[in-house]
């Protein structure tokens, strides 16, 4: 959600911070700002809107200096405007603070500070932080001690960075439940909410753990725990290339990432499947003996990852015969679920920082339940705090609406299900070999779908004024219908709902008119005739039918107003192929309606608040 950057070195801090904020744009934001230390003064520059608006402001009011912090804000408290934008300062602008997360007790703290004469300018929870630091300094505390004292006063999950005018060469930082990284360059240090701003200049990085704080200057870095004990951090080599974050000639990250899916599948298949069709997960630390005893799996996820988990439930129950429940992380943690020793919690998160999923993992570990997470960022908090993790291996995903991470999650869940079936002796070598051979054909089939993207582009041009969409699917493709609806409303702002085909007559059919497009996912399968019945019901009520069918299909195609054919495959693999035209439909609908597909309004790539 919010993005934090910081810098101390020889370069112009304003330029470094702005470039860093641009790298964090994909996380979602509504305002941006920086604070730069200049000869003992803190120069705060911030604006509502995009980074380009901040850059325009900086051309008029530059912020010279070599040390500073910056922030992109995604509003949680107070509307998006310049006053509520970060950084925030104390009464006399002696300290500036940027913050990601939520201060849950800010109203109580604000009331206490007002009684002591503090005057607040914004409606944010963040503004209490510089005033708390100011109050500590009034009581004779040093900058360092004031910063440390702050952590015991605030409740919630957060990351903070601060600069003081009396220490013009130093940047302070801390985190308790929200991600922060330190980057080490040549005679300079960087701070960021994720790896993307650090790829150009940093040779090594350190992932700050929850409950750690510290400070850095041009040539100094110190790290402590919340008790004040000094720590000895180990920096890791930074391996992500700047080119990995480039659009690669595509107009948007989303369409680039859609087109990367075949290559990602080739990579996963090559790394996960041996020549003898054996499936390997070398990163899983839990023993095969422990995994073979698992008799229940609870999948925790949010958004698109939740729908991937729903497909994973089908796979795990079908192949490994393990009772599997898929739950929204935000709901699981607020009840008292019945779990036993041989239950496995599986958290799914692209970023590895999803706040609700992380909280659910903490809940599971408090009950002594083993956790294996499926994450795209193996250095993330969720990966570090799980007993083990599985690499999604989708590569950096910058577009806010997840595409390639979704299909990579589904493929990994399928392979993990076969792996678990093998541990439990529930699949023969021959059965596994046949299935693996079909999986190996997926990349070429994805390429064939993407080669027909222009058909979806033309189709989407007919629905620029549509106000509602309905998506229908059954069994494995019910979650695909829900994911297709989510994608469309996320980036084209068209209201859309996804339903199980069997539930259509139980309410949603009342919405059908000649102005409502209905996407029917109807590949050849055991329940194909049921989907054809849905299509006939829609046609009888003059609904607009868009069908996704298997190549060569005539029955469903003849009943449809628009049709897109996917290569033939088993029902088990059909979700992977069926979702790709829905991703394209969402993308081209957004373009046709003039919506920004990479930065849809109100959305954040990494949801780090609960």
Curated annotation (Swiss-Prot):
| Reaction(s) this enzyme catalyzes, per UniProt | D-fructose 6-phosphate + L-glutamine = D-glucosamine 6-phosphate + L-glutamate
Q: What is its EC number?
A: 2.6.1.16
Q: Which residues form the SIS domain?
A: 287-431, 459-600
Q: Does the keyword Transferase apply?
A: yes
Q: What UniProt keywords are attached to this protein's entry?
A: Aminotransferase, Cytoplasm, Glutamine amidotransferase, Repeat, Transferase
**What would be an example GO MF term here?**
glutamine-fructose-6-phosphate transaminase (isomerizing) activity
- Residue ranges constituting the Glutamine amidotransferase type-2 domain according to the UniProt record: 2-219
Question: Does the record bear Transferase in its keywords?
Answer: yes
Q: Which GO terms describe its biological process?
A: carbohydrate metabolic process; fructose 6-phosphate metabolic process; protein N-linked glycosylation; UDP-N-acetylglucosamine metabolic process
InterPro entries under this entry?
A: GATase_2_dom (IPR017932), GFAT (IPR005855), GFAT_N (IPR047084), GlmS/AgaS_SIS (IPR035466), GlmS/FrlB_SIS (IPR035490), Ntn_hydrolases_N (IPR029055), SIS_dom (IPR001347), SIS_dom_sf (IPR046348)
Record Pfam families:
GATase_6 (PF13522), SIS (PF01380)
- Identify the catalytic residues: 2, 605
HAMAP family, A to Z: GlmS
Q: How does it assemble?
A: Homodimer.
Give the protein's function.
Answer: Catalyzes the first step in hexosamine metabolism, converting fructose-6P into glucosamine-6P using glutamine as a nitrogen source.
Q: What is this protein called?
A: Glutamine--fructose-6-phosphate aminotransferase [isomerizing]
Q: Please tell me the species this chain comes from.
A: Leptospira interrogans serogroup Icterohaemorrhagiae serovar Lai (strain 56601)
